């Protein structure tokens, strides 16, 4: 029996909560395979990044390993390089010495997050303080 493959791209709130929902519904079915792909192996609770930056919380207080959160959804730590919509294939690389990994899908969820828009204002990207990652909070 051919399984229906669902791939979720992105390990932020959108991707992880989609995976959690599917973990309790579709992923229970024998004919469905759900996979979450993220470059990070943890969910970062970004609303508390300012607490890490101020020293009130440790970084470990606001991260949760994705693998521990999911029972039936497979997790793949990889970087998405491109998506072939015609072939229904996601091209990724994984590992320190990037190894190609191609994942076929029947249904694709895009939850890749966002990038800060500085609206073309000169010098802002280099001097602005952003809080989107643990690295930002450590600075």
Where are these regions (language model features)?
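Beta1-alpha1 glycine-rich phosphate/pyrophosphate-binding loop at the start
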Residues: 1-82
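FAD-binding core/adjacent interface of flavoenzyme oxidoreductases
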Residues: 1-3, 74-139
């Amino acid at each position: 029996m051919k399984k229906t493959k669902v791939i979720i791209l992105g390990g932020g709130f959108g991707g992880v909560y989609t995976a959690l929902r599917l973990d309790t519904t579709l992923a229970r079915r024998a004919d469905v395979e759900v996979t979450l792909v993220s470059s990070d192996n943890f969910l970062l609770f970004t609303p508390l990044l300012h607490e890490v930056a101020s020293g009130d919380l440790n970084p470990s207080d606001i991260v949760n390993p994705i693998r521990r959160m999911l029972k039936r959804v497979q997790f793949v730590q990889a970087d998405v390089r491109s998506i072939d919509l015609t072939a229904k294939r996601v091209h990724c690389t994984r590992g320190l010495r990037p190894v190609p990994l191609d994942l076929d899908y029947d249904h694709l969820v895009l939850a890749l997050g966002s990038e800060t828009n500085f609206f073309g204002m000169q010098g802002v990207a280099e001097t602005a303080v952003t809080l989107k990652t643990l690295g930002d909070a450590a600075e």
